[in-house]
Curated annotation (Swiss-Prot):
Pfam families: FA_synthesis (PF02504). GO terms for cellular component: cytoplasm. It is an enzyme of class 2 (transferase). Its EC number is 2.3.1.274. This is Phosphate acyltransferase. The gene is plsX. Homodimer. Probably interacts with PlsY. Its main location: cytoplasm. It catalyses: a fatty acyl-[ACP] + phosphate = an acyl phosphate + holo-[ACP]. It is found in: Cytoplasm. It comes from Ehrlichia ruminantium (strain Gardel).
Length: 341
């Protein structure tokens, strides 16, 4: 393996998580180093079973020269319950990668593995930031004009008003640090914009956020149909609704792309029209490719943890790596603590 300089940002990688590990993971690291992180001095602490990972590492000299491999004896499985992973998977690649943040070996971690286990182990090993009750899963979502931040995406199926309040603060800090929005517009997801709409929890969270309106750019409620119009920068909701919104959005984007491909293959004229439109369509619709927006951060933990989609290919995983690197560079947790204070 290569000699890592002290000034290098070290990222821990769970090489065993995901549907296509370790090939997509190591290939994604290579893509990230060659295309997305060329201006940064990055190294990887790669955790996994040596008989699985080392043959793949041998194919990628750039990754091999910028990484340290750590052999682990166990793997968190996709169907492991969080409680089981906490009890029985202490020797897994996921656990060891997370623990490297606690020991100071790594500055952040990325994994395609079991979401519930990743959150449970991260909370147990790293703990939460001061004044944070529950971490939230957060990502940036493409829209008509610019990306917006959406949280929670599934960590908390049910939330208290205070948790939603904390999510709003954390989401605002994330938008400032990662999206470079100086004064992000924050809104609660609801079924209408009137103050009387929504559940009791949502209305109570609304009241809490109104009390600090001068310190946070709170814009009230936003409906799902308005999220992608650039009206707000941060959309806050519970994990159930957030997960549904994200998956429906990804499904719609995929369906539209599929329908268009079928339409332009129906006749010679359609194929010719598709050929003429292709450059403009690629330019306008490529930003909605979910692979380019892969990587959800677990906000509120005492460490930078990023979840990559379980079915990530090399491109998708590379973008998740970019998320964890950016979070470390922007010192996102320090900014969250500052905002809360």
């Amino acid at each position: 393996m290569g000699n890592i300089q002290m000034s290098t940002i070290s990222i821990a990688v769970d090489a065993m998580g995901g549907d296509f590990a370790p090939e997509a993971v190591v290939g994604g690291l290579n893509f990230a180093l060659m295309n997305l992180l060329v201006d940064h001095n990055i190294s990887f602490n790669i955790y996994g079973k040596e008989d699985c990972v080392l043959p793949v590492l041998d194919k990628y000299k750039t990754v091999r020269d910028n990484s340290v491999f750590i052999n682990t004896s166990d793997v968190v499985l996709a169907n492991d319950k969080p409680s089981f992973a906490l009890r029985k998977r202490k020797s897994s690649s996921m656990w060891c990668a997370i623990d490297s943040i606690k020991t100071g070996t790594s500055s952040g971690v990325v994994s395609c593995g079991n979401t519930g286990a990743l959150m449970a182990i991260s909370r147990f090993v790293l703990g939460t930031l001061p004044n944070i009750d529950r971490p939230a899963i957060c990502t940036k979502v493409p829209s008509k004009f610019q990306d917006f931040v959406l949280l929670d995406l599934g960590a908390n199926i049910e939330c208290s008003a205070n948790s939603l309040f904390q999510f709003a603060i954390m989401g605002g800090a994330f938008a400032k640090a990662v999206l470079n929005i100086p004064n992000p517009k924050v809104a609660l997801l609801n079924v209408g914009q009137e103050e009387i709409k929504g559940t009791g929890v949502i209305r109570e969270a609304f009241s809490l956020l109104k009390e600090v309106e001068g310190k946070i750019n709170f814009c009230g409620y936003v409906e799902p149909k308005d999220m992608v119009d650039g009206k707000v920068d941060v959309v806050v909701t519970d994990g159930f609704c957030g997960n549904v919104v994200l998956k429906v959005s990804e499904s719609i984007a995929s369906t539209i792309a599929s329908i268009f491909k079928e339409s332009i293959s129906e006749s010679i004229v359609a194929k010719f029209a598709g050929l003429l439109l292709k450059p403009r369509l690629i330019k306008n619709f490529s930003k909605f490719n979910p692979k380019l927006h892969n990587g959800a951060m677990f906000l509120g933990l005492n460490g930078v943890v990023v979840k990559s989609h379980g079915n990530s290919d090399e491109l998708a995983f590379a973008n998740a790596v970019k998320v964890v690197v950016n979070a470390v560079i922007h010192d996102i947790n320090a900014k969250i603590v500052h905002e809360l204070n």
